[in-house]
Design a protein with these regions (language model features):
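Short, small-residue-biased leader/transition segments that mark boundaries at the very start
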Residues: 1-3
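Structural signature of hydrophobic alpha-helical transmembrane segments
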Residues: 6-17, 41-44, 105-110, 139-145, ...
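Transmembrane alpha-helical segments of multi-pass membrane transport proteins and ion-pumping complexes
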Residues: 16-28, 48-53, 77-90, 117-121, ...
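Junctions where cytoplasmic loops transition into the N-terminal start of transmembrane alpha-helices
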Residues: 56, 61-79, 138-139, 177, ...
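Oxyanion-binding "anion nests"
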Residues: 128-171, 178
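Transmembrane helical segments that form the transport core of multi-pass membrane transport proteins
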Residues: 157-263
């Protein structure tokens, strides 16, 4: 693994851990129920919609709360796409003289704060190609952590439920709550990596797997349908309703914390340590 990838993985782990625990604890202080707080913390700290759905599958949360949190993610990400490049241009050139370092820190900052992968790609391209490369790497590293976070959530809940029932928690309970589709994703990734390594798939000049047109079409259609369904289940007045107000403020406060703490982590890793190590 190259130095750039190593720093990206380190940042991903730090950001996910710190932001998840802050978002969860702050949500609980705002009197958000435990399951919704876990869904919110997972979606905000890892990768938005996918992480929210995964956490909801593990905790068995309310579908209406899940839909609300997903809606928040998708609504907030739109201004974030433009806000983050503006902040990067306004702040980073006053800290670093090297434009390349500015791009790296900006990409790391954007990759760790914007909740959706597509939003990260679009926002970081506004800054530049180097920023885009770093942002995408860090976001990919965060996405991988979905399974890790899901496992620890399941372990925590099994312990809590085991205590209440007077039974010792078992791996069987953890396995019951663990999202099995993550294993399928990992297995599919390994299979395709092996097949591509043996030259069984066509790759472009950068070594990226050439995606078949039909597969890309179905992927686009089903993702579009999924987001349309989320929108159909969302009413804008519910976003600011009294019932959801605590959840809204918890999300916004955690997102603000995410922006600040990710900036500091990216600053240290990509602005100080990486240039020192060359």
């Amino acid at each position: 693994m190259c130095i750039r990838d190593s720093f990206g993985l380190v940042q991903a782990c730090l950001v996910v851990a710190v932001v998840w625990f802050f978002a969860f604890r702050f949500s609980r202080r705002m009197k958000v129920d435990e399951r919704s707080a876990m869904i919110l913390a997972s979606g905000l700290s890892i990768c938005g919609v996918s992480a929210s759905i995964t956490a909801a599958r593990v905790v068995g949360g309310d579908d209406r709360k899940l839909s609300y949190i997903v809606s928040l993610v998708l609504i907030v990400v739109v201004p974030m796409i433009y806000l983050m490049p503006w902040l990067a241009h306004a702040i980073l050139p006053h800290i670093f003289d090297d434009p390349h370092v500015v791009q790296e820190v900006a990409g790391a900052w954007i990759g760790g704060t914007i909740d959706t992968t597509s939003g990260v790609a679009a926002s970081s391209m506004i800054v530049g190609e180097v920023a885009n490369q770093h942002a995408v790497i860090i976001k990919a590293a965060q996405n991988v952590l979905i399974g890790v976070v899901a496992f620890f959530i399941a372990l925590y809940l099994s312990t809590r439920r085991g205590d209440k029932a007077g039974q010792a928690p078992s791996l069987g309970i953890v396995w019951e709550k663990f999202p099995k589709f993550i294993i399928g994703f990992v297995a599919a990734s390994l299979v395709f990596s092996v097949l591509q390594g043996n030259g069984l798939f066509t790759a472009d000049a950068r070594g990226k797997l050439a995606e078949p047109g039909v597969a890309k079409m179905f992927s686009t259609v089903f993702f579009s349908l999924a987001f349309v369904c989320v929108g159909l289940d969302t009413r804008l007045k519910d976003i600011v309703s009294r019932e959801n107000r605590n959840l809204l403020w918890a999300f916004l406060a955690a997102q603000a914390f995410n922006i600040v703490v990710t900036f500091l982590i990216a600053l240290v890793l990509f602005g100080v340590l990486k240039p020192m190590l060359g």
